[in-house]
Amino acid sequence: MTVASIPPHAIGDLQGCCSPLQTLLTALPANAPLRFVGDLVNRGPDSLGTLRRVIMLCEGGRARAVLGNHDIHLLAVAAGVRKLGKRDTLDDILGAPDCDALIHWLRHQPLAIFENGFLMVHAGVLPQWTTGDVLELAGAVERELRSPHWKTFLTDAFGNQPAKWSSDLIGIDRLRLTINALTRLRFCTPDGAMEFETTDADGAPDGHVPWFDVPGRRTRGTPIAFGHWSTRGLVMRDDLLGLDTGCVWGGKLTAARMTLAPAGREVIQVACEQAQDPLAHKK
């Protein structure tokens, strides 16, 4: 079997946890293609080492990655439009001699990947979107991040509004909503209004459901690999592969084979030392 014909393994949120990544890599087949679901950096003890390792894997042709909310936060801090939070662990990247090169690489990564029938995003997709819509909307954001005016773009890219999709949205509102859906979404209403405050898997606000449980979701039937939701943990359904199993919180780092047939989705997990206290995070 050639490398190109081997199904990739999708890997959950790293968040700067390099040691578990190294352990996981030794447990995977040496030639297995890798797909990272985003949040490569932040909150863990070695954001710099983690990012450099992922870049090495990607530039070597073995891996691909999508951007998560923590990755975009790093871009904004590097651009000077956001400040570090008290639990951020990004100083090692920002102070690295190759910081500019690392940021350049990061801002050229996609927000969505569709290959071999599998869609991959960091957080979720809105129920009104088709797979084609996801790729088109993600592409518009990607062009801004890769452009010479990327710092100016990020100045206006943050905020919770608009929270509801409309095909009439234009400009920065359309781009901001796209970023929020692809990198922050957990719960939404059946008509696609997003809610960003609730993280507990069993704590759905009134009128809201997990994005993947919305009746009539237009991507239903297309397998989607995602991360972002550590309190929900491993999600294994015919058309869902949720891989954030809380490595940075002392959970596990998870890889799963991305096969269209659910029976082929072998799961490999390694234990992680706790780098952040989830209870302190909620205070």
Swiss-Prot record:
It comes from the Bacteria. Pfam families: Metallophos (PF00149). One of its GO terms (molecular function) is bis(5'-nucleosyl)-tetraphosphatase (symmetrical) activity. It catalyses: P(1),P(4)-bis(5'-adenosyl) tetraphosphate + H2O = 2 ADP + 2 H(+). The keyword ATP-binding does not apply. SUPFAM superfamilies: Metallo-dependent phosphatases (SSF56300). Its EC number is 3.6.1.41. InterPro entries: ApaH, Calcineurin-like_PHP_ApaH, Metallo-depent_PP-like. Gene3D superfamilies: 3.60.21.10. Keywords: Hydrolase. Belongs to the Ap4A hydrolase family. Hydrolyzes diadenosine 5',5'''-P1,P4-tetraphosphate to yield ADP. This is Bis(5'-nucleosyl)-tetraphosphatase, symmetrical.
